[in-house]
UniProtKB/Swiss-Prot annotation:
One of its GO terms (cellular component) is plasma membrane. Belongs to the OXA1/ALB3/YidC family. Type 1 subfamily. The keyword Chaperone applies. The gene is yidC. Required for the insertion and/or proper folding and/or complex formation of integral membrane proteins into the membrane. Involved in integration of membrane proteins that insert both dependently and independently of the Sec translocase complex, as well as at least some lipoproteins. Aids folding of multispanning membrane proteins. It is a multi-pass membrane protein. It comes from Stutzerimonas stutzeri (strain A1501) (Pseudomonas stutzeri). This is Membrane protein insertase YidC. InterPro entries: Membr_insert_YidC, Membr_insert_YidC_N, YidC/ALB3/OXA1/COX18, YidC/Oxa/ALB_C, YidC_ALB_C, YidC_periplasmic_sf. Residues 35-59, 126-152 are annotated as: Disordered. Residues 36-54 have a biased composition (Low complexity). GO terms for biological process: protein insertion into membrane; protein transport. The chain crosses the membrane at residues 7-27, 365-385, 435-455, 468-488, 513-533.
Amino acid sequence: MDIKRSILLVALAVVAYLMVLQWNQDYGQAALPTETAQSQPAAPALPDSPSATTEGNANDVPAVAGQQQASALPTSAPSSQLIRVRTDVLDLAIDPRGGDIVELHLPQYPRRQDRPDVPFQLFERSSERTYEAQSGLIGDGPDKASGRPQYSSEKTEYQLAEGQDALVVDLNYSADGVNYIKRFTLERGNYALKVNYLIDNQSQQPWTGYLFGQLKRDKSGDPSSSTATGTATYLGAALWTKDEPYRKVSMSNMDDKNLRETVQGGWIAWLQHYFVTAWIPQAGDTNQVQTRKDSQGNYIIGFTGPAVTVPAGAQGETGATLYAGPKSQDKLEELSPGLRLTVDYGILWFIAQPIFWLLQNIHALLGNWGWSIIVLTIVIKLAFFPLSAASYRSMARMRAVSPKMQALKEQFGDDRQKMSQAMMELYKKEKINPLGGCLPILVQMPVFLALYWVLLESVEMRQAPWMFWITDLSIKDPYFILPIIMGVTMFIQQQLNPTPPDPMQARVMKLLPIIFTFFFLWFPAGLVLYWVVNNILSIAQQWYITRQIEAGAKPA
């Protein structure tokens, strides 16, 4: 039994080590831009000259179905004067040339906890980074391979006023007898905004166009992650299809080939740590979903909607929804089926989702994620109480017969076959399951890993405080107090277990608390908190059962 337990513990240590590497990759403090002593804490300023922005290119405009992608043609530089739009949850900038969203900040989500005045930025167009939400009308529409339309607006700044629930921003453009209004509708407290096109065909010919929406991004890293050795969380595109409600399309996939599929409704998205951007077409539309790289090396995932025909002298409308914000499962599920799957819990999603649901409901009562994790740990411990009790009884009996096991070892010496037979007879006589002590580890491992992914992926944990020095449960304990406490509890629990008869095994077991403490130094404080509370509860349960066994009484 001791050999198998040692193997399981070492396996857990290896898994923990791999997760430490991944955690370092995913949860490094994002660096803020270098500031001078005179700089003021504020959102990045809008560019004031074309040289401060990345110029558009013809590949921004997708090809109409059945046509080849247009080759790059010279286009005008983006507008120097962007249109700023602010609500309580979104602060974005629209380029009048094309009407693309080229900047977007999230005022409710500081980039770093120690700088609450600097909001996290999703979309950005600069010399260092490209990440935009683009949309337009092709076919007879104003978006051509030769250039994008130059829209006009009444103002260059729009603000959701106090007491106002919605904000409408209209961009206007006219060409060839057709009047276009590109309308952005933003609502209070909503990260989803509607982008609609109103088409007034005053020409003498019927007008036929196709709506497209796409996300364009360069290969720069996730701003919420830092570079380290290990496997990064997923940074890339994803889409919905009828057969695959959540299909990842990585940058390497786009390097290899372009994707083109026909889907009914659905969505296309770009994922990063904690946040997601997604275009959601109208549910009943049949759309062409495509991925490609443009001439500047940017990665593009987008959709092209069905043909929209507006007769001469008539009016028409088409549009889609853009989401740009946190990976909030409830909000995402309301927008489109399967969009909540962008909160990627990995292969243990079937365990992680109930854990998150339970944790969320506990938090609704307590209002603190740290205490919610403690209560969740107690609930999980109670759920596995009978199984743990049986395991601890087995270990307590093993501890009680340790002198007999040592005597057998001395009796048979190096004759392992006879010693093993004698051990099995002893186990049978004492009614001991030699594998019983392994069950707590086997049971806790999936729950531990699932909780790890809950803390990793759930934006609710981002910058969530507990108490005292733990101001962010999603990052490591800044003073390593919790990992040290965890190591101490692991050492205490180890003293309640039977001593392995093999000296080498005994030395390995003594080292495990130190090894685990080292690994857990870089784990998120919330996960270490779970492990500490679980260890304390296990110690209490195991101590009680061991005392009962050693006293010769049957445990309750």
